[in-house]
């Protein structure tokens, strides 16, 4: 299970790298993700680790945060269409709530320019990195979590069931951060990032738990999220939590630089090793013992076979000697045997 977190998602590639090197990734039978976690889940379902790592190591901010000129009035309309401000992003200023106009201007100022971002660059990355035919024919469910608006209801989509175009739209929707990207339309409904606080699900365990899996690996991108294990009473949840802060909004979530990806991949690998290292070493030792036992058994079998062969040869030699003695005896008695 892969949590959302924008540019911090490179951390999950590091976790995958460790599992891949140890051969543990072959035992994963379902993946689920929100936002960048959904993209990484799709990369995992595509089955090509090296392609996923190359994508993250060569990523450029301009590929994700593609400029799209937009004015403050347009941002106001955009926020209004999303239908999220009053329900989620109303900001109290004393006894009053900041108006949509003030919020829009603040967002534009925060971004440093009067524009939001298009999805053109991410669409290119999706087409470059994903093997949709592999996803569609896989036995591995691959869930993307999105938030339907304006009702703010959580929706889960198994990407195997959709065409390349529809799956791309769902991945864009799952990562459509309000105030940064526009919402996405899918089959007549509009969707935003599935990890929006309070109403979304940034750690989407439910889809894989509902499959009846008894062990779920959760790869967090934040040190703050706490999972209620009582909601999954029949499953063991193994959590991989960043041992260092992966960054905030600007230097983490919106950090789509190659340098940022490199150190987060290293950190993910390191943290996965800390969680699974003992298990892997025990498994290796068990495997060594199994190989030793198999070698011993083969040696024992070879010894038994050789012993039986020698005994058979000795028996033939004794029979031949007895036959020679009998022939000599008969000859001495003048009897023809």
Where are these regions (language model features)?
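Patatin-like phospholipase
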Residues: 1-34, 42-337
